[in-house]
């Protein structure tokens, strides 16, 4: 039996927000794909105008590729011939319809909407331009509508209409009842799904659908519209072989492709850039981009790397083949532009292709050398969403660094146990710090930031005006010499390494000012992918926001360079769970605008809005 969604290329496109809680009891509901389900409220969109989503909607529903039409036409005509030969094919539509424009001359997409959706469109935008508008209503007549559109009264009439029209694709654009009927009748090939990361009152909701019948095949970059983050998913029908890339190949395709980009970067091969998903011509649904949006061509060396990794024919490939039997990732995306996949792709690459090594802790690791991640702080706050992170602990530790503190008890008294294992008597004795008091961590990060070169005695002494205050110098340079190439903060003091409970992992960062914006690049020599790196991404992103504010700048980018990147053997099973999860849109970070001195920030000055996340994943720290 033919799949009509594929024959007639019927898609759904929608934008959904989080639903504002209506009672105290609903505030702590766990997050899930159904978190984003709000479609409308009182006859209009729940949110105010979201320009990014509107551009995306317009781009998706107006884009056509003339070169592919003949193939689509042949497919539809073949179906109609087969239908006719079987005695079917009643092509008489029951609807009373009209249409504006000569469909035969210009290839366009069809947009199908219910009456309420049609009436919610502002008058100046009716009918939606450069699209064949179809309104589904049992009560609307052509006398009720001044604009020239098709009016039909059932989904069956829509199928009859599509048999007659010359069109590229058909998009169901709302409302909830139309979505529900098309999904229940298996008439949707793909769902273009915008996740608006804000909570609003809603009275209309996107219908539930069988997620075993659809899988996520694309996750876009994270964008920001007037302070609200959003991203774009594509759900593809399982086994449909659709444009978004649902295929019957390996279920590890998604992360393998991301890992290939990570591997290419480790091998000094430039990774392909991703065009923003502003329409179906982007990588968001697998079609070739027009020239100005197309990613740059790969180098011969990169093509070789990609080919070898895909075919599993290299030395690493043979290792991957056997490992794949263990790694049963459910994610089947081909096109993953969400920034969190940089992190997930590195983990996947290390698990599949890493070198097995012993390590200081005795646990053992798989490791690789040299990765890079970039995060756009002007759009979002990169707090990982595939597991819940201890944000309060991240902020308290950063403030502790900024104050130049080395007393682990300060954090423990706030129930922040990040450094607890490194301050025990046993750990300090193993470091030959027999004279050191428990939880005296020595001249670690904060001491080097604020007192570089000073003689360290113990955690109780006063070091005011001793050593070099690197943080103060960094802020001074940003304010007074913003083009300086010496705006560097370094925690790696060779003379003090033996006195530290733990030598610094993130050892150096540099700041860059351009066009009123501040970027930070950080080099991390030792990178615990399971536990440490998620904290480091968030911490240095917050740090960049703080320094930008006190210097009257806007945050731009955080760039994370990873040296020895490793996965502990006792973290692998937990990380497999994390790799199965689809990221949510990142949250946003707001600082108290009244704070102008870096030392004046307190925990109450930080607000994280719309942090949607998966459940916590427990991993034991290797100390």
From Swiss-Prot:
Question: What does the UniProt keyword field contain?
Answer: Methyltransferase, Multifunctional enzyme, NADP, Nucleotide biosynthesis, One-carbon metabolism, Oxidoreductase, Repeat, Transferase
- Pathway named in the protein's UniProt entry: Cofactor biosynthesis; tetrahydrofolate biosynthesis; 5,6,7,8-tetrahydrofolate from 7,8-dihydrofolate: step 1/1
Regions of biased composition (Basic residues) lie at: 291-304
UniProt xrefs under SUPFAM superfamilies: Dihydrofolate reductase-like, Thymidylate synthase/dCMP hydroxymethylase
EC numbers on record: 1.5.1.3, 2.1.1.45
Region (3 X 4 AA repeats of G-G-D-N) residue spans: 88-103
InterPro entries found in the cross-reference section: DHFR-like_dom_sf (IPR024072), DHFR-TS (IPR012262), DHFR_CS (IPR017925), DHFR_dom (IPR001796), Thymidate_synth/dCMP_Mease (IPR045097), Thymidate_synth/dCMP_Mease_dom (IPR023451), Thymidate_synth/dCMP_Mease_sf (IPR036926), Thymidylate_synthase (IPR000398)
Molecular function as annotated in GO: dihydrofolate reductase activity; thymidylate synthase activity
Catalytic residue list: 505
Q: Where, in this chain's numbering, is substrate bound?
A: 13-14, 53, 173, 179, 194
Q: Using the record's annotation, list all stretches that form the DHFR domain.
A: 9-237
Residues of the region (Thymidylate synthase) are 337-623
sequence repeat ranges, renumbered to this chain: 88-91, 94-97, 100-103
- The positions annotated for binding dUMP are 360, 506, 524-528, 536, 566-568
Q: Which residues does the annotated region (Disordered) include? A: 263-309
**Keyword NADP included in the entry's annotation:** yes
Record-level GO cellular component terms: cytosol; mitochondrion
Residues annotated as transmembrane: none
The UniProt record gives the binding positions of NADP(+) as 15, 38-44, 115-117, 137-139, 153, 174-181
Q: What does this protein do?
A: Bifunctional enzyme. Involved in de novo dTMP biosynthesis. Key enzyme in folate metabolism. Catalyzes an essential reaction for de novo glycine and purine synthesis, DNA precursor synthesis, and for the conversion of dUMP to dTMP.
What is the UniProt domain comment for this protein?
Answer: The repeat region is missing in the pyrimethamine-resistant isolates BUR-98 and BUR-151.
Family that this chain belongs to: In the N-terminal section; belongs to the dihydrofolate reductase family.
Know the name of this protein? Answer: Bifunctional dihydrofolate reductase-thymidylate synthase
What organism is recorded for this protein? Plasmodium vivax
Q: What is the lineage of its organism?
A: Eukaryota, Sar, Alveolata, Apicomplexa, Aconoidasida
